[in-house]
């Protein structure tokens, strides 16, 4: 387990400001005109960690892929470039993000390559064992009962399928200090990995990478055959 994290120093604590609740709520579930703006910002701010997730997924051309919390849809569109013979689905419980992704990638939608769905990941609208690969980025903070969501992802993944969960953990002290606990439930990395195991996955690896000013954690897991 990596231990390369440093706590905030005294100087850091003086300048850290907590994200306003209104903005934090938009980060969880973008809505209205402000949500449209947040969607644009999020697309830029999360691109690097999404690229890392695609690398960790080890996509094959015929893979069927699920993104939980598909947001702007840009990552799923990139995945479609690799999984060129597969089908790809994204689900998001923000109507703003669902509309934005559907419009932004309407070409892929029209071709039947990608489908964006409006809904919640604790009740996924997909058949058992429908996907070869699945991933979720910056979603776990917003799951009131994370085991329910993870169990659903396990249900729709095929045996020997691969799942990658990306998040900022409680060990990232700056993230914890600046994001209100009323909206963000920020758990330790080890606790998240244990939840993934309890959902039925085998945890293959846990990684940490510095992405700009963010310290990202990645849990790589597989569904046993």
Residue ranges of model-derived segments:
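Core SAM-dependent methyltransferase catalytic element
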Residues: 199-200, 208-225
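A short glycine-rich, Lys/Arg-flanked "PGG" loop and its adjoining helix->strand segment in the class I
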Residues: 147-159
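Class I SAM-dependent methyltransferase SAM/SAH-binding core
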Residues: 64-123
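A short acidic, Gly/Pro-enriched loop at the edge of an enzyme's catalytic core
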Residues: 122-133
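Conserved class I S-adenosyl-L-methionine
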Residues: 162-191
